[in-house]
Amino acid sequence: MGGKNLIEEGKKLGYQVTTIYSKDFVLFSNEFNIENDVNLFIQRNISHNRALITSFLVEQLGYPVINDHMTLIRCENKIFTTYILAKHNIPTPKTFIAFDKTNAMEYSKKLGYPVVIKPVEGSWGRMVAKADNLDVLYSYLEYQEFSTQKYKDIYYIQEFVNKPNRDIRIFVIGDETPVGIYRVNENNWRTNTALGAKAYPLKIDEELKELALKVKDIIGGFFLGIDIFEDKDRGYLVDEVNGVPEYKNTVRVNNFNISKFLLEKAVEWVKK
């Protein structure tokens, strides 16, 4: 859910909303202007590279954009996300970065199996793998080394959090946390809806709200999807932050109009 729904809701609110497709977006470096009268851009490109670059270009034109390119960098690069949050004492899964397979294997042993290896950039749970022992880890490391990943020689390795068969997705819009979901997967340890997890309504308690807003203050941005694990001993752990969050399943199970809420809050923000 994204551009089309935002346009429909914008019309209902009396706003003039249109979609600019990245495939049609061309900007010369010496011609910083857009013909239309624009107050705000909302980034909905599911391609990280295109989202990052188009947000950057729009900012150079002098327009506000949700989200700005620096927020997207901090969100979409898992190394940046994890280490920035950890520096600010946000609870996160234990993670290390290695630039060599030997070190990756050595420190995985110290971390303790099973471990999870993730691509530095990516979404929907793609290429996220659990290694139960050294042999399995070596296979994953070797596969990554010869893949076409952008960061194929940088290894992002994380503890396996023994969470319930679910995780939490909370949406932050402006300074509010209006809605969230549980993502439950009975058949896979990965709880992405793209991998078969089902969405269920979430009642956001004060602890979750406070944590999500702290993350927003650290990462920046206006519209975020924050993924949180529940650990029986440590409580809530922030796993990832999405700078262009999808929300179709959240709307469906909560009967909450995210597009309308986002547009109203965005207009308030621009007017300030």
Regions found by a protein language model. Give the residues of each.
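A long amphipathic alpha-helix within ATP-dependent nucleotide-binding catalytic cores
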Residues: 189-238, 259-272
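Glycine-rich phosphate/pyrophosphate-binding beta-alpha loops
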Residues: 242-255
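Conserved N-proximal alpha/beta basic substrate-recognition cap immediately N-terminal to
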Residues: 1-94
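Short, well-ordered alpha-helical microsegments
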Residues: 3, 49-52, 104-105, 164-167
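Phosphate-binding site of ATP-dependent enzymes
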Residues: 129-219
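Active-site nucleotide/adenylate-binding loops and adjacent lid/helix of ATP-dependent enzymes
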Residues: 32, 59-62, 70-155, 206, ...
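Protein kinase-like catalytic core scaffold
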Residues: 115, 156, 178-179, 224, ...
